[in-house]
UniProtKB/Swiss-Prot annotation:
It is an enzyme of class 2 (transferase). HAMAP family: tRNA_thiouridyl_MnmA. InterPro entries: MnmA-like, MnmA-like_C, MnmA-like_central, MnmA-like_central_sf, Rossmann-like_a/b/a_fold. It is found in: Cytoplasm. The active site is at residues 104, 200. GO terms for molecular function: ATP binding; tRNA binding; tRNA-uridine 2-sulfurtransferase activity. This is tRNA-specific 2-thiouridylase MnmA 2. It comes from Geobacillus kaustophilus (strain HTA426). The record marks 129, 341 as: Interaction with tRNA.
Amino acid sequence: MNKAPHETRVVVGMSGGVDSSVAALLLKEQGYDVIGIFMKNWDDTDENGVCTATEDYEDVVRVCNQIGIPYYAVNFEKQYWDKVFTYFLNEYKAGRTPNPDVMCNKEIKFKAFLEHAMSIGADYIATGHYARVEFRDGEYKMLRGADPNKDQTYFLNQLGQAQLSKVMFPIGHLQKADVRRIAKEAGLATAGKKDSTGICFIGERDFKEFLSHYLPAQPGVMKTLDGEVKGRHDGVMYYTIGQRHGLGIGGSGEPWFVVGKDVRENVLYVAQGFENEYLYSTSLKAVDVNWVSDRKPEAPFRCTAKFRYRQPDVGVTVHPLADGGAEVVFDAPARAVTPGQAVVFYNGEECLGGGTIDEVFRNGEKLWYVG
């Protein structure tokens, strides 16, 4: 039997942004016993000695006082360093392009934070993610957020039944404009705060400069797959598949793009033209595949997939593998599919799960230059 809202404790992960602020407000208005928790995941002091986390926490304090809910901060810096940041660096070292948001959701927000919330008597946790949870046919389904421009299920692809049974997404049914309007009408301190962009621990800083503090740059040669040298690079980890800007290749004609990298030889491979065949692949192998239902499909099946966050769904056939991975065959050749990024599967509105892109193929042949 479900408890009444006033007997149900919901711990809200609050970032100091408008989305989590409105999530907390809506739960409070619905009568839940709400506690706000600020997760301190990164020791971040900028060049001026200002810690952005301190500013964000001050916004959490203001909002919680306005709403009338208790709040406090919890430090997850060690877990974040061990589980998210170390993974991030290791992937870059290996020449891949990782997605730290996926790992942060898996290891911090829906693991360390969830466990902490349960230890203080929470019935549920809630976040400001644009996603929805529904219980039907005897299981929890994760559905896309109602605002197609803000849907965040791509980053939540590693969640399963244990997490979804304990999670609320109070703004998942709303458009972003509605969230802003609700915050404004309630006079919340964060109503006009701009959305954070980029990777949380880098913030507004220059990515190359940030990474160089942890991974010393190793400049090297930039060449075509035929071996023609086109210039020098600053370090292969600074570039991603499909990248166009910052290559410094002169001359006329179509622009040049990164098509691959060889970490061992420290070579960056480039090709000319947006439609260059070297940018395209027809299938991939994914590892660490998670199924939201907790049930691995027995047979190949058709669905749609995304290979990056801001990409329209494409038709694919998924072949589950015995090792827990999956082979994903595309209906049409796909451009700049990048090892290290997430491949996420959908059936209409439902997010089925996802994994990490490990290898990329064209017509059955592994693209050796992609990594």
